[in-house]
């Protein structure tokens, strides 16, 4: 580990003024800015070593916890109201805005949901380049048979029972990551019904065109 990397914990206000937790990893000789957009249910600490490495390579790097996750979650997720898309429209968009006056270009890396999020950003034009990994559709039909059974059991049996009892998806009990707010669970479950994920959702018309044309 490069022990010269200075790490700074900083508050971040989402576009609706929700308080988020973020961390800045300062490069000794910064050449660019980097924003890491995390996966569903993955706290920012998971990306610490990568962020430190990026900073050692000249990127002033920011990580954040989306609302409802990590240090940005309320005392209880029961009754916590939000939508899955808030992570992109309100949280990541605010993180992008944090860099709008920076002298150096901003790049993003998106993991899983973080990869989907780039096409949902209202301020994508502020990003000079974007790399995504581990970003999939989530439809069970693309998966091997054994995985299909596990996924369908999650959506049709385990998830409904767990959310009815808890009021949120106790994801951590399954060793899958952090617990998820009910709104995230419901939208995620809905999108995974479609082969092309949210692009096929009739409640989100024109989304594919907005991704293609950059018209947010």
Residues of each region from the PLM?
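Alpha/beta-hydrolase active-site loop
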Residues: 81-100
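Active-site glycine-rich loops that stabilize anionic/oxyanionic intermediates
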Residues: 31, 36-42
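Active-site nucleophile loop of the alpha/beta-hydrolase fold
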Residues: 113-116, 131-141
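Conserved alpha/beta-hydrolase
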Residues: 44-77
């Amino acid at each position: 580990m490069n022990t010269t990397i200075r790490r700074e914990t900083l508050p971040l206000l989402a576009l609706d003024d929700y308080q988020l937790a973020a961390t800045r990893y300062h490069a000794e000789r910064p050449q660019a800015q980097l924003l890491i957009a995390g996966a569903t249910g993955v706290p920012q600490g998971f990306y610490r070593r990568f962020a430190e490495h990026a900073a050692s390579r000249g990127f002033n790097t920011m990580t954040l916890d989306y609302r409802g996750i990590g240090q940005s979650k309320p005392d209880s997720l029961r009754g916590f109201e939000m939508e899955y898309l808030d992570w992109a429209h309100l949280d990541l968009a605010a993180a992008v805005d944090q860099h709008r006056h920076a002298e150096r270009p901003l790049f993003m890396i998106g993991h899983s949901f973080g990869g989907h999020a780039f096409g949902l950003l209202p301020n994508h034009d502020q990003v000079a380049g974007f790399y995504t990994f581990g970003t999939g559709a989530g439809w069970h039909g693309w998966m091997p048979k054994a995985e299909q059974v596990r996924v369908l059991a999650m959506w049709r049996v385990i998830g409904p029972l767990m959310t009815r009892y808890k009021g949120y998806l106790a994801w951590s009990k399954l060793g899958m990551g952090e617990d998820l707010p009910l709104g995230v669970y419901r939208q995620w479950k809905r999108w995974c019904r479609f082969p092309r994920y949210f692009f096929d959702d009739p409640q989100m018309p024109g989304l594919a065109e907005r991704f293609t044309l950059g018209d947010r």
